[in-house]
């Protein structure tokens, strides 16, 4: 029932950069199936990888702006809506090349039910997770906030800009989360890792990312 409520709630979100949910249904082996608009170009990372290198910077910046607009919208709602699971797989690209934020609410419910201070977050997503969400006392659970969305979006921007996962220098996601918990952040890669973005834009982008990754949540920028 809670999932149904979340789906109905998300159906009320009307923004050009939020993947529309058209309805819910049931089918074999799936008691609840969500019907969404079709995103013809798949997820953002795969889409960028399929472009010619000179095309990528402008397209990447467009996608980032699309998702920032979506986050500004949902965080500004009354009450605010928090995504809680931002990474490149949850950004889809439609036939027109627009970035669409998807899969929030439902993923958050699943994680609330399963994740504690002693649990392990699945799918490699610890690389994107704000440290306040896993620096917990035994038995505590997490609660995502607009500030933790900002942190995760910063990690996602780094991935889209360099086409490499956050904390690429760490062997695995546990090492990445340990580093983040100690206040460490991804090492700045050489300028050529950002493709054709250009040195001046890389400098501006990195300064923004450092603000988005601030260890203290209140020091992170709003969308």
Which residue ranges define each predicted feature?
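Catalytic-loop of the protein kinase fold
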Residues: 75-93
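A conserved short helix/loop substructure at the end of the activation segment
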Residues: 213-223
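Regulatory alphaC helix of protein kinase catalytic domains
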Residues: 3, 7-8
């Amino acid at each position: 029932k809670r999932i149904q409520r979340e789906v109905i709630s998300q159906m009320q979100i009307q923004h050009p950069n939020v993947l529309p949910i058209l309805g819910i249904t049931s089918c074999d082996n799936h008691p609840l199936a969500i019907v969404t608009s079709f995103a013809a170009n798949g997820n953002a990372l795969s889409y960028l990888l399929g472009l010619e290198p000179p095309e990528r910077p402008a397209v990447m910046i467009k996608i980032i702006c699309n998702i920032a607009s979506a986050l500004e919208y949902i965080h500004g709602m009354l009450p605010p809506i928090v995504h809680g699971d931002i990474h490149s797989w949850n950004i889809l690209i439609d036939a027109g090349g627009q970035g669409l934020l998807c899969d929030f609410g439902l993923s958050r419910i699943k994680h609330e039910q399963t994740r504690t201070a002693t649990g392990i977050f699945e799918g490699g997503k610890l690389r994107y997770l704000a440290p306040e969400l896993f620096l917990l006392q035994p038995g505590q659970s997490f609660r995502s906030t607009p500030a933790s969305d900002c942190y995760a979006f910063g990690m996602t921007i780094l991935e889209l800009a360099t086409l490499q996962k956050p904390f690429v220098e760490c062997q695995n996601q546990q090492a990445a989360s340990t580093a983040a918990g100690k206040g460490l952040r991804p090492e700045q890669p050489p300028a050529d890792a950002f493709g054709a973005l250009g040195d001046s834009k890389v400098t501006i982008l990195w300064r923004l990312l450092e603000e988005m990754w601030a260890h203290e949540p209140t020091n992170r920028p709003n969308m």
